[in-house]
Amino acid sequence: MGVALRDILTDLKRPAETDELKGVAAIDAFNALYQFLSIIRQPDGTPLMDDSGRITSHLSGIFFRTANFLTQGIRPVFIFDGKSPEMKGRTIQERRDVREESKEKWDQAKKEGDLAGAFRYAMSSTAIDAYILSSARQLIQLMGLPVVDAPSEGEAQGAYMVLKGDADYVVSQDYDTLLFGTPVLVRNLTISGKRRLHGRQITVQPERIVLSDVLSTLDITREQLIEIAILTGTDFNPGIRGIGAKTGLKKIKSGEFDSIIREKLPDFDPEPVRSFFLNPPVTDSYTLDPGRIDRDGIRAFLCGEHGFSQDRVDPVLDKISKKEKQKTLESWF
C-alpha cells in the first residue's frame, strides 16, 4: 500500500503527543480495517470469528480501539473508499495475487506447526470483502460516529477535509496521504501498543508527520515529492528499478525527472498520476455531526449477533457514556 518514501521521511517522523491527537481524526477506513484484520488474530493466524464462522477481528478493533480514542479526546471520522481509478488496476491485481499465494503458504505453515510463519502469512492474506465493509459501517454508526463516502481514494478525501478545516489530521499507514496534500499525517494510531513482529514483542507508538516540515527540510515542493514517488512507484504506476527514495530525491533536485522517464519508461505518461495526486476526486457531501451511541443496538450487534462477551462490552460502553456526560457538562461552561 502507498508509496516507498520511508527512507527520506524517517528523520521527519516524531512521536505524537497526547494533546496533538485531540480533535477530529479523519481515518482512512480501509487502511484501519486492514490493520485490524491483519493483527487481531489467534497465534496460528486464524482471525477472530463468531459461531457462524463470520470474521469479527475488525469489529473488535473498531469497538475497543475507537472507544479508547473517544476517552482521549480524539473524535474519529471514518472515510470509506469509493471507485478506484483505472490506473490502480495493476496494483489491485498484484495484491490479489499476493493474498492468494499467502493463503496457500499460511495453510502449509499451519500443517507444519510453524506458528510464526503461519501468523506472518495470515497477515499477508488479509482481504476486505462486502461483509467486512457493511458490518464495520454498521458498528461505526451504532457508536454514533460520522461516516464519509469518498468518491475515490479515502486518503485524498481525508486530506481535503483537513485542508478545509473540517478535520485536524489524517490517520493512515500510507505515506501517499502526504502526496494528496494533507498538512498532518498520523501513523500507527490504530495499531499502537504492544505488537508481535518477526517473533518478538515491540511497542508501536503513534507518529506524526507534518507536510510543511517535510518540504522545508528536504528543500522541495509538493510537486517534487510527487515526482519522487512516481520514480519509486505508486499505487498508480510501477517504479523504476534501482531508484529508491534517496536516489529519487537526488534526481529530482538535479532536475532529471523528465529525462529519466523518457529513458527508463518511454511509454509511460506521468501526467495522469501527477494530476490525480494534485487534484483527486473529493466531495463536500458529508456531515460530521456525531450521533448518540446506541448502547442497546451495540449489545444486540456485538453480543447477540457476533458472540462478544457482554462482560467485556458493557464496561467499554460505560466508559464512553461517562465521557459523553462529561462533555455535556463542560459545554455549559
From Swiss-Prot:
Its EC number is 3.1.-.-. Mg(2+) 2 binds at residues 174, 176, 235. One of its GO terms (biological process) is DNA repair. InterPro entries: 5-3_exonuclease_C_sf, Flap_endonuc, Flap_endonuc_arc, HhH2, PIN-like_dom_sf, XPG-I_dom, XPG/Rad2, XPG_CS. Residues 117-255 are annotated as: I-domain. SUPFAM superfamilies: 5' to 3' exonuclease, C-terminal subdomain, PIN domain-like. Residues 325-333 are annotated as: Interaction with PCNA. Pfam families: XPG_I (PF00867), XPG_N (PF00752). Its cofactor is Mg(2+). Interacts with PCNA. PCNA stimulates the nuclease activity without altering cleavage specificity. It comes from Methanospirillum hungatei JF-1 (strain ATCC 27890 / DSM 864 / NBRC 100397 / JF-1). Keywords: DNA damage, DNA repair, DNA replication, Endonuclease, Exonuclease, Hydrolase, Magnesium, Metal-binding, Nuclease. One of its GO terms (molecular function) is 5'-flap endonuclease activity. This is Flap endonuclease 1. PROSITE patterns: XPG_1. Transmembrane segments: none annotated. Residues 1-99 are annotated as: N-domain. The gene is fen. Belongs to the XPG/RAD2 endonuclease family. FEN1 subfamily. Binds 2 magnesium ions per subunit. They probably participate in the reaction catalyzed by the enzyme. May bind an additional third magnesium ion after substrate binding. Structure-specific nuclease with 5'-flap endonuclease and 5'-3' exonuclease activities involved in DNA replication and repair. During DNA replication, cleaves the 5'-overhanging flap structure that is generated by displacement synthesis when DNA polymerase encounters the 5'-end of a downstream Okazaki fragment. Binds the unpaired 3'-DNA end and kinks the DNA to facilitate 5' cleavage specificity. Cleaves one nucleotide into the double-stranded DNA from the junction in flap DNA, leaving a nick for ligation. Also involved in the base excision repair (BER) pathway. Mg(2+) 1 binds at residues 28, 81, 153, 155.
